Amino acid sequence: MKVTKSDIVISAVKPEQYPSGGLPEIALAGRSNVGKSSFINSLINRKNLARTSSKPGKTQTLNFYIINDMLHFVDVPGYGFAKVSKTEREAWGRMIETYITMREELKAVVQIVDLRHKPSVDDVNMYEFLKYYGVPVIVIATKADKIPKGKWEKHAKVVKQTLDIAPSDELVLFSSETKKGKDEAWNAILAKINK
């Protein structure tokens, strides 16, 4: 999909701050520093609409971006960052749970994992949490450019097995450097919002 317009709408914490208008939403979740902002920027052809950070755990709000006036990307705070206090982690959990369970506009969650590594316990917990609530998931395995092409299948198998990816959910290998998987990611997203 060609993105001609993309802007941040609001950084929200509470449901009353979520945008109105009924546009379909795709939430993006992933461990801190997994490359979520790079994934968003790569999909929308912008250098830094979603701010990339060398400081993990920087996003502490739900950041709503409007894309081509037809859908919202919702950047969810990164999970699994050890230096965040227990209180902050609990607040994060409540905010995510409220959004995922109450938001009718939510069509799917893009869960971002690092193709180079076996998904972490936090990744597995997040995937299971989404499945528990019946949320469709698109798993994006980033940093494919850091692995020789001949090993992609082996790494993809580890991701599939560790997360126990449901047959209805997709796995897309992606690289924000080479743009590998960009079209597949968009196709998967558009299929979910057009259901």
From Swiss-Prot:
InterPro entries for the chain: G_ENGB_dom, GTP-bd, GTP-bd_ribosome_bio_YsxC, P-loop_NTPase
Binding site for GTP: 30-37, 57-61, 75-78, 142-145, 174-176
Domain of life, source organism: Bacteria
Annotated residues for binding of Mg(2+): S37, T59
PROSITE patterns reported for this sequence: G_ENGB
Keywords linked to the UniProt accession: Cell cycle, Cell division, GTP-binding, Magnesium, Metal-binding, Nucleotide-binding, Septation
Gene Ontology cellular component list: cytosol
Residue ranges of every copy of the EngB-type G domain listed in the record: 22-195
Molecular function via GO: GTP binding; metal ion binding
Cofactor(s) this protein requires: Mg(2+)
Gene Ontology process terms (BP): division septum assembly
Similarity comment: Belongs to the TRAFAC class TrmE-Era-EngA-EngB-Septin-like GTPase superfamily. EngB GTPase family.
HAMAP family, alphabetized: GTPase_EngB (MF_00321)
PANTHER family recorded: ENGB-TYPE G DOMAIN-CONTAINING PROTEIN, MSS1/TRME-RELATED GTP-BINDING PROTEIN
Function in brief: Necessary for normal cell division and for the maintenance of normal septation.
Protein name stated in the entry: Probable GTP-binding protein EngB
